Design a protein with these regions (language model features):
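Short glycine-/acidic-enriched loop or helix-start segments at secondary-structure transitions
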Residues: 57, 92-94, 115, 143-144, ...
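FAD-site-proximal beta/loop scaffold in flavoenzymes
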Residues: 99-128, 211-287
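Beta1-alpha1 glycine-rich phosphate/pyrophosphate-binding loop at the start
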Residues: 1-50, 58, 91-96, 142-185, ...
């Protein structure tokens, strides 16, 4: 098949290249892998190109896009499409003071450091003296570790206990040994500001109750259990949302079914409600790990192959090529 890849960023790889720290995934390996796809297999990678439906929605990384293409045009010009746009929309709780400029998300924090280190911007990300990261997943751990490497005193605060942290006991204990102060069973209730500048974060102590809809113990506020941590930078790592290239109204017009959380609905073959459109990765599942995302991409590739074969009546043999 002739394969074209569209990516809004200046380098291929998405979050692997522009957010996940180098000590987890060396970005040069990702870029070299993409180069190998071009040189050995003839894949065309169109960078700095954003795909949209109707009006483009601004998300992290869009500033690099020099060209936009509508998804309607792709549907006309290609035999099959695979959407793998991930989760680029971060969540910040609606609490007093959250609109302060020193409040950011783990994704934004890591992304801005990466584009600065790559030399794509001369604007250095903010370096705080006391940085508080809220969350218990890998994004929280990565942001805390990056903040620690800037020389800041770093607190990582999670509303459940270390046992329930999505990043796992090993990761939390590791960054504790490096110097991050981990505080469990606490949830932010207010960003304390002075002249619109962050000065501290007020937390509510929590206890664990019966399991919630996720199956994990539900955090329950302890009356009167409030405390504050001095901070000049607050980083929220409280979840990311799927970012398909089209929102609900545009999706309905095209006939593409989205789930309530904004993820793309697919069947067991990774096929969407539009037969020629497939989807894979976090835009389907929500935030996950690299392994499952890659696995779903491979599954989608096989499904596209068999679907095109059935459509044309020509079954082409399928073989996997392992690249170095």
């Amino acid at each position: 098949y002739n394969v074209d890849i569209y990516d809004k960023l200046p380098l291929p790889g998405g979050l692997m290249t522009f957010a996940i720290p180098q000590w987890r995934i060396p970005p040069e390996r990702v870029v070299n892998g993409a180069r190998e796809l071009e040189e050995k297999f003839g894949v065309k990678i169109m960078l700095r190109t954003k795909i949209y439906a109707e009006e483009p929605v601004h998300e992290e990384g869009d500033d690099f896009a020099e060209k936009t293409i509508s998804i309607e045009d792709l549907l006309k010009n290609y035999d099959a499409l695979l959407i793998a746009t991930g989760t680029w929309l971060s969540k910040i709780p609606r609490i007093p003071g959250a609109e302060a400029k020193e409040v950011t998300t783990a994704l934004e924090y890591l992304y801005k450091w990466r584009i600065y280190e790559y030399g794509y911007t001369s604007k250095k990300p903010p370096i705080g003296k006391n940085i508080v990261v809220i969350g218990g997943g890998y994004s929280a751990v990565d942001a805390a570790e990056k903040a620690l490497r800037t020389g800041a005193e770093v607190y990582l605060v999670y509303r459940r206990t270390i046992k329930e942290a999505p990043a796992g006991l090993y990761e939390i204990e590791r960054i504790k040994r490096e110097g991050v102060v981990f505080i469990e069973l606490a949830s932010p209730v207010e960003i304390i500001t002075e002249d619109k500048t962050v000065k501290a974060i007020k937390f509510q102590k929590m206890t664990l109750g019966p399991p919630d809809e996720t199956g994990r113990p539900k955090p329950i506020p302890i009356p009167g259990g409030e405390f504050t941590i001095e901070a000049d930078l607050a980083i929220f790592a409280t979840g990311e949302s799927p970012t398909p290239p089209l929102k609900t109204t545009a999706a309905e017009k095209l006939g593409l079914k989205l789930n309530k959380d904004g993820s793309i609905a697919v069947n067991e073959l990774m096929q969407t409600s539009i037969p020629k459109v497939f989807a894979a990765g976090d835009v389907v599942t929500g935030p996950s790990r690299i392994g499952p995302a890659i696995k779903s991409g491979l599954k989608a590739a096989r499904s596209i192959h068999y679907w095109l074969s059935a459509k044309t009546g020509k079954l082409v043999s399928f073989s996997e090529v392992i690249t170095q």
